[in-house]
Swiss-Prot record:
Residue stretches of each LRR repeat: 826-851, 869-894, 992-1016, 1017-1041, 1043-1068
Major localisation: cytoplasm
GO cellular component: cytoplasm; membrane
Sections of the chain in a coiled coil: 417-437
Biological process according to GO: plant-type hypersensitive response
Alphabetized PANTHER family for the sequence: LATE BLIGHT RESISTANCE PROTEIN R1-A-LIKE, TUBULIN-SPECIFIC CHAPERONE E
Top-level division of the source organism's lineage: Eukaryota
Name of protein: Putative late blight resistance protein homolog R1B-13
Record localization: Cytoplasm; Membrane
GO molecular function: ADP binding; ATP binding
Record's bilayer topology term: Peripheral membrane protein
Family in the record: Belongs to the disease resistance NB-LRR family.
Note: This protein is encoded by the haplotype B genome of the allohexaploid Solanum demissum.
Length: 1141
C-alpha cells in the first residue's frame, strides 16, 4: 500500500461529520505534508533529487508515518496500510488516534525537517545529467501546480489555533507563489510557441523543474513552524532564508551557465520560430508580467520608459480579445521576445560590470535602446486602442456628440493646464464634430430616408470616435496614459473623422442634410417634432383636441393637457401645433417651454421671436416689461395659436397670461403640465384634458413603427416585441427609449441578446452567468431609468436596482458575480444604484464615467480617491450606523456634482476645504451635513453658492453672545435645520431672500428670534416647526406683515402654550396642521377670517384646541361660505380623555 492510499483515506475521512474542527485541522495538516512528499517522490528519476537529499527526507517521512500508524493500532494499522481498511472504519471501531499522539508525531516531523534543512543546498548536478525522457513541459507544469496549490493553503489560513497558521511568513510565501506562477507561465509560453519538437529545449524545462522543486523544498523544510518551544530558528531568520531562496535568479545554475543564459538561449531559439508560428498568439498578459517583474530599476530613462510600456501592455492585454489583434500577432511576438532578450541580457552584463552605462549595454547587445523601444511603443498604443474599442458601450445615443462637445468646452476651460499639450488637436476635433452635427440630426429625424444604411453606419462610426475622444481627454486629466500615446491617438481620431466626413460627402449626403435642415426651419408649417412620425396613437384624443382648437367659444380658450411624466403630452401638443389643418386657421403661431426653473425674459423672447419671425439677439437688451408689452401689441389684432409647454406652477402661468389678449377672435392656447391643479387654474372655458394611458395595441404599433419604420416586424421577433411593449407599462416615452436602444442593436440579434433582461420590472429569470450577460446586464426599474435618461445625460451600461431581493442576493453572492470584482469591467457605466439591495464596503473609483451613484455603505469614512469619479453629478451614500461619516476634502474637486446626499457627514479637513478646494457651482441639493459650529456652516455655504435645497444639522456647540445673520445662497428655496435635542436657542438669523420652504427641528425659539428671522423670509410658503421649545413664557406672537406668502403652517410637538396672531398675519394661508401640541390653549380666532384657509388638521391636542378648531370650521363653512374648507380631528390627547372620564 502506497502513501497515495493513505491520502485518499484521509480525504474521505474529512467527509465524516463526527470529527471536530481540531480533528479536521489535524487531518488537513497531515494531507498538506503528504502532498509535498508525493510530489517530491515523483522526481525520483532525476539525479538532482537524490543529490540534494530530497528523496532521503521524503522516504524517511513515509517511514515515520507508517510506524506511527502501526504503533497506534498494530492490527488495524496493517490493514489500513495495505488498503483493506478505511480511516472511517478505524474510527467506528473506536481505535481513536488521539490528538496527543499526533502532536508527538508532528514534533518528530519537525525534528526530521530540521535535521535535513541543515544539510540541504541547491543541487550541483549538471543540467545535462538530469535530461530524462519523463521531463515534458506538461510534467513540469503539473509539478508546479501541486506546489502552488499546497502553498496557497498556508496563505489562506487565518485561524491562530490551526497547525498551518504561519502569520510571520505570509509575505515571503506570497513572493514564492508569484515566482512559481510566473515560472509556470514561462514554461507554458515556450511550449505553446515552439513548432519544433519540445525535447530540443529540455535544458530550459529541467532548469524550471529544479528551480521550482528547490524553492518548494526550502519552504516545506521550514514550514509550518511548530510551537515556539520546538523552534530552533526565529521567525525573522526563517523569513530571511525564504527571501534568499526567492532571489535565486541571481545565482548560477552551474559554472558558466546562469539562469539568464538559459532564458536568453530559449528566447533566441523562439525568435527564429516566430515567422512560422503566425497562428499561435503571444498576446497574453502573463508573459508581459514576467518581463515586468524581472525589470531592473535605475539604469536609465530609457529603461524607465520600457518598464512603463510593459506595464501598460500587461494591463491592457488582460481585457483584449485576441481576435482584435490577429493581424499583428507576429509583431507582438517579436516585441515580447525582444523585450525578454533585452531584460535577461542586462542581468548578465550588470553582473559582470558594476557601473554599467547605457553605452555599455548598447555595445554589448548590439542595440540602440532608444530606437529599439519605438516598435514597443507602436504595439503598446495599438493594444491600448484595441482594448478600449472592444469594450465600447453598444448603446449609442445619437445625441452623444452634443454631449461630447459640451464636455470638450467644459474640459478646456476647467483643465486648461492638463490639456495644454493637446489644445490644438482638441480644437480641430471640436470643429470636425460641429461640422458633422447637422448630419446626425437628420439621422435622428429621418431614420428611413434613401441613405438609411449609409447614414446609420457613418453615425455609429462618429459616435464611436466621440467615445474615444472622451476617453482620451479623461485619461489626460487623470494621467492614466502617457502623453506620447494620447497625441498619437488624437491624431488618428482626426484622420479617421476626416475619412468619415469624406465618405458622407462622396454620397452627397451632406448636401441633402443641409437642405433638410433648412426645410425644417424655414416655415412654421413644417415644424415637425422628433416623434411626429410616430404619432400612431391617441387618434380619438387628437380629434377631440382639434375640435376644441378650431370650434367652440368665440373668446380666448386655454386647452390644458395634464398627465404623469412619459405619457406623451408634449409630443401630442407638438403634433397639434404642427398640424397644417390647424395652423392654417391662425395668423400667428408661437411656442415656449417653461420647465421647473425658468427665466421670464427668455420665455418672452422665445414667444416674441416666433410671433414676428426674427432672431432674439436684437431684442436681448430690452427690459422684460417692454418685451411683454411688445408681445401683447403684436398679438392684439391677430388670431393666434400659442403652445406653452411644461408649466409647473400657477405663478408661471400668471407671469405669461397677461401677454395674451382676448378680443373674441377664437385665439387658442395649448398648455401642458404634470399637475392637475395647474391645468385647472389655467383653464378658461374648456375642461382640462387628463391624458390616458396607452392601449396595448397602441404600445405595439408605436414600438413597431419606431424600430422598423414602414417595414413590418418579422414573425421571429414579434413575440419578443409584444412582450417588450407590454413591459413598458403603456408609457410612450418608455417605448421610444427602448425602441431607440433596439435600433442600436442589430435587429436580428435582439432575441438572442435576451434583451428582456434590460427592462423587466417585477421579475427576472435567473440565468447562468455569461460574457454576453456581463456586457449588457441591466437590473433596472424603468421609471427611474427614464427619469435619468430624460434629464439629458447619456446612460451607457446600467447596473440598477431591482425589486426581487432573493434574485439579487443570489446574484451578488455567487463567486462569479462578486460585485466589487465585476463592476470594474463595466468601464462605461454611467448610472449605478445599489442602494436597496446590498451593503458595500468600497467605492467604485475605477468608473470615471459614472454620472449617478447610489449605495448603502458600511464604512465610516470615504476614501480621497472618490474624486476619481470626477464626472459624477449625483452622489447618494447611506451609512449602516448613526455615526458621523467623514467626507474627504477631495469631494470638492468633483465640480460636476449637482446632488449630494450623505446623511450626517462632516468635512474631514475643514482648513483644506477653506484654503484649497474650488466651489461647487453646480451643486443644487446638499443633504445632510453636520456642523458643530455656525462658522462651519458659513464655510460650506461659501463653497456652494448655487444651492436650491439644503438639509443639515447644526449642533452649535459654541454660541455667540448675540444673533448672527447666516446668509444663504440667493437661489435657496428649501431649508431644513435640525438638532437631536432642543437644548439651546438657535444662534443665528436665517437670511434667504427666495426661501419658500423652512423646517426647524430641535431648537429653543422665542418671539424675538422668529420676528427677526422672518424679516429675511418674505417669500416663505411653507413653515414647519418640530420639537421646538418656546422659552420660559412659552408664547409666540405673530404680527401683521411677517408671513405675507405663507400657505402651509405645521406645528408638531411644541411647548407652545399661548399663541397670539394678528388679523392679517397669515393673509393667504391654506393649511394649518397641529400635532401633539398638548399645552396649547386654543387656536387664535383670527383663523376664522382667513378666506384662503382650506384645511385644518388636529392630532394629539387637548379639548380646548379641538373646540376652537370646530368654531373655526363653523365660521368658515356657514358664515364665509367656504365650501372647500375641511377639518380633520384624528384624536384628542390621552390624558384629556382620562381626566374627562
Amino acid at each position: 500500500m502506497t502513501k497515495r492510499v493513505i491520502t485518499d483515506r484521509l480525504r474521505s475521512t474529512l467527509q465524516d461529520s463526527n470529527y471536530s474542527d481540531v480533528g479536521r485541522d489535524l487531518i488537513n495538516f497531515i494531507l498538506w505534508e503528504l502532498k509535498f512528499l508525493d510530489c517530491f517522490l515523483h522526481l525520483k528519476s532525476l539525479p538532482f533529487a537524490s543529490e540534494c537529499c530530497m528523496l532521503d527526507v521524503s522516504q524517511k517521512m513515509i517511514e515515520i508515518l507508517k510506524s506511527r500508524i502501526l504503533s497506534i493500532c498494530p492490527d488495524s494499522g496493517i490493514q489500513l496500510w495495505k488498503g483493506n481498511l478505511s480511516m472511517k472504519t478505524l474510527y467506528l471501531e473506536d481505535v481513536r488516534v488521539t490528538l496527543d499522539s499526533f502532536g508527538y508525531w508532528k514534533e518528530v516531523i519537525w525534528k526530521t525537517k530540521q535535521e535535513f534543512s541543515a544539510e540541504y543546498s541547491f543541487p550541483n548536478t549538471s543540467l545535462a545529467a538530469n535530461k530524462v525522457d519523463d521531463v515534458s513541459p506538461k510534467f513540469v507544469m503539473e509539478v508546479i501546480d501541486v506546489f502552488v496549490e499546497n502553498l496557497n493553503v498556508v496563505v489562506k489560513i487565518n485561524d491562530p489555533i490551526s497547525w498551518l497558521f504561519v502569520p510571520e511568513h505570509k509575505e515571503q510565501i506570497e513572493q514564492v507563489l508569484k515566482e512559481l506562477k510566473l515560472l509556470r507561465f514561462f514554461v507554458w509560453f515556450v511550449s505553446n510557441k515552439y513548432i519544433e519538437p519540445q525535447y530540443q529545449h529540455t535544458t530550459f524545462y529541467i532548469h524550471a523543474l529544479i528551480e521550482a522543486s528547490h524553492i518548494s523544498m526550502a519552504v516545506w523544510l521550514h514550514l509550518p513552524v511548530c510551537s515556539k518551544g520546538n523552534q530552533n530558528l526565529a521567525p525573522s531568520e526563517v523569513s530571511r532564508l525564504l527571501s534568499d531562496f526567492v532571489e535565486m535568479k541571481i545565482k548560477a545554475t552551474e559554472p558558466g551557465i546562469s539562469r539568464n543564459n538559459i532564458y536568453i538561449d530559449v528566447l533566441q531559439d523562439l525568435k527564429l520560430t516566430i515567422p512560422q508560428a503566425q497562428k499561435k498568439h503571444a498576446a497574453e498578459s502573463g508573459i508581459v508580467e514576467i518581463l515586468t517583474h524581472s525589470m531592473m530599476v535605475g539604469l536609465s530613462d530609457q529603461m524607465a520608459n520600457l518598464q512603463e510600456m510593459l506595464c501598460l501592455l500587461r494591463d491592457n492585454l488582460i481585457h483584449l480579445p485576441i481576435l482584435d489583434l490577429e493581424f499583428h500577432l507576429q509583431d507582438m511576438d517579436s516585441i515580447i521576445v525582444d523585450a525578454g532578450l533585452l531584460i535577461y541580457s542586462l542581468y548578465d552584463i550588470k553582473g559582470e560590470k558594476e557601473d554599467t552605462t547605457l553605452e555599455d549595454i548598447n555595445r554589448e547587445l548590439g542595440f540602440d535602446l532608444p530606437r529599439n523601444i519605438e516598435p514597443i511603443k507602436v504595439i503598446v498604443y495599438l493594444v491600448m486602442q484595441k482594448a478600449f474599442q472592444c469594450n465600447l458601450p453598444r448603446i449609442h445615443g445619437l445625441g452623444y456628440v452634443d454631449f461630447l462637445l459640451k464636455n470638450l468646452k467644459d474640459f478646456q476651460g476647467r483643465y486648461s493646464d492638463s490639456l495644454a499639450f493637446l489644445k490644438n488637436q482638441i480644437q480641430v476635433i471640436q470643429m470636425e464634430f460641429e461640422i458633422l452635427q447637422p448630419f446626425l440630426k437628420v439621422v435622428v429625424e429621418e431614420p428611413h430616408n434613401k441613405f438609411k444604411r449609409l447614414n446609420e453606419d457613418c453615425a455609429i462610426q462618429i459616435i464611436r470616435k466621440a467615445h474615444e475622444v472622451e476617453y482620451v481627454v479623461d485619461a489626460c486629466i487623470n494621467k492614466g496614459i502617457p502623453h506620447w500615446c494620447l497625441e498619437r491617438w488624437l491624431q488618428d481620431i482626426i484622420e479617421e473623422t476626416t475619412c468619415i466626413k469624406a465618405k458622407i460627402q462622396e454620397k452627397n449626403t451632406v448636401e441633402d442634410t443641409m437642405k433638410t435642415v433648412i426645410t425644417h426651419t424655414s416655415s412654421q408649417l413644417a415644424r415637425t417634432p422628433r416623434m411626429n412620425e410616430e404619432i400612431v396613437w391617441f387618434k380619438d384624443v387628437i380629434e377631440n383636441l382639434r375640435n376644441r382648437l378650431l370650434n367652440g367659444t368665440k373668446g380666448q380658450d386655454v386647452i390644458s393637457i395634464h398627465s404623469m411624466p412619459g405619457l406623451g403630452k408634449t409630443t401630442l401638443a407638438n403634433r397639434l401645433y404642427s398640424d397644417r389643418s390647424i395652423v392654417s386657421q391662425f395668423d400667428i403661431c408661437a411656442q415656449c417651454c417653461v420647465s421647473q426653473v425658468y427665466s421670464y425674459k427668455e420665455l418672452l423672447l422665445a414667444l416674441l421671436c416666433d410671433a414676428i419671425g426674427e432672431g432674439s439677439d436684437q431684442h436681448r437688451e430690452i427690459h422684460a416689461n417692454e418685451l411683454a408689452d411688445m408681445l401683447r401689441k403684436t398679438l392684439l389684432p391677430r388670431r393666434y395659436l400659442i403652445l406653452v409647454d411644461d408649466v409647473w406652477e400657477n405663478s408661471a402661468w400668471d407671469d405669461l397670461r397677461g401677454c395674451f389678449p382676448d378680443v373674441n377672435n377664437r385665439s387658442r392656447i395649448i398648455l401642458t403640465t404634470r399637475h392637475h391643479e395647474v391645468a385647472k387654474y389655467a383653464s378658461v372655458h374648456s375642461e382640462p384634458l387628463h391624458l390616458r394611458m396607452f392601449e396595448e395595441d397602441e404600445s405595439w404599433k408605436l414600438l413597431e413603427k419606431r424600430v422598423f419604420g414602414e417595414e413590418s416586424c418579422s414573425p421571429l421577433l414579434k413575440d419578443v416585441g409584444l412582450r417588450i411593449a407590454k413591459m413598458c407599462r403603456q408609457l410612450p416615452l418608455s417605448i421610444v427609449l427602448v425602441a431607440d436602444v433596439l435600433l442600436d442593436f442589430c435587429k436580428e440579434r435582439a432575441a438572442e441578446e435576451n434583451f428582456l433582461l434590460w427592462i423587466k420590472r417585477d421579475q427576472i429569470t435567473k440565468a447562468a452567468y455569461s460574457h454576453k450577460q456581463h456586457t449588457h446586464l441591466a437590473l433596472t426599474e424603468m421609471d427611474t431609468l427614464l427619469e435619468w435618461s430624460t434629464s439629458g445625460s447619456l446612460v451607457g451600461s446600467v447596473l440598477f436596482k431591482n425589486y426581487d431581493p432573493y434574485f439579487v442576493r443570489s446574484l451578488l453572492s455567487s463567486h462569479a458575480f462578486e460585485i466589487s470584482h465585476i463592476l470594474p469591467h463595466f468601464k462605461f457605466l454611467k448610472v449605478l444604484d445599489l442602494e436597496h439591495q446590498v451593503v458595500i464596503d468600497f467605492i467604485p473609483t475605477e468608473l470615471p464615467y459614472l454620472r449617478y451613484f447610489s449605495a448603502l455603505i458600511h464604512q465610516n469614512s470615504i476614501p480621497s480617491s472618490i474624486s476619481n469619479l470626477w464626472n459624477l453629478e449625483t452622489l447618494i451614500l447611506k451609512g449602516t450606523s448613526a455615526k458621523t461619516l467623514l467626507l474627504p476634502s477631495t469631494v470638492w474637486d468633483m465640480v460636476k456634482l449637482g446632488y449630494l446626499y450623505i446623511p450626517n457627514f462632516s468635512p474631514e479637513n475643514k482648513k483644506a476645504l477653506l484654503e484649497n478646494s474650488p466651489k461647487l457651482d453646480d451643486l443644487e441639493t446638499l443633504s445632510n451635513p453636520y456642523f458643530a459650529r455656525v462658522e462651519d456652516a458659513e464655510l460650506m455655504l461659501r463653497k456652494t453658492p448655487n444651492l436650491r435645497k439644503l438639509i443639515c444639522e447644526v449642533e452649535c456647540l459654541e454660541y455667540p453672545h448675540q444673533y448672527h445673520v447666516l446668509n444663504f445662497p440667493v437661489q435657496l428655496e428649501i431649508l431644513k435645520f435640525y438638532r437631536s435635542k432642543a437644548s439651546k436657542t438657535i444662534p443665528f438669523c436665517i437670511s434667504a431672500p427666495n426661501l419658500k420652504y423652512l423646517k426647524l427641528s430641535g431648537y429653543y425659539l422665542d418671539s424675538q428670534y422668529l420676528s427677526e428671522t422672518v424679516d429675511h423670509l418674505k417669500h416663505l410658503e411653507v413653515l414647519k416647526l418640530y420639537n421646538v421649545e418656546f422659552g420660559d413664557y412659552r408664547e409666540w406672537e405673530v404680527s401683521n406683515g411677517k408671513f405675507p406668502q405663507l400657505k402651509i403652517l405645521k406645528l408638531e410637538n411644541l411647548s407652545l402654550m399661548k399663541w397670539i396672531v394678528a388679523d392679517d398675519a397669515f393673509p393667504i394661508l391654506e393649511q394649518l396642521v397641529l400635532h401633539d401640541c398638548r399645552d396649547l390653549m386654543e387656536i387664535p380666532s383670527c383663523f376664522m377670517d382667513i378666506l384662503s384657509l382650506k384645511y385644518i388638521e388636529v392630532d394629539m391636542s387637548n379639548k380646548s384646541v379641538v373646540k376652537s378648531a370646530k368654531n373655526i370650521e363653523e365660521t368658515q363653512v356657514e358664515d364665509n361660505q367656504n365650501t372647500n374648507f375641511k377639518l380633520v380631528i384624528i384624536k384628542v390627547h390621552y390624558w384629556e380623555k382620562l381626566y374627562s372620564a
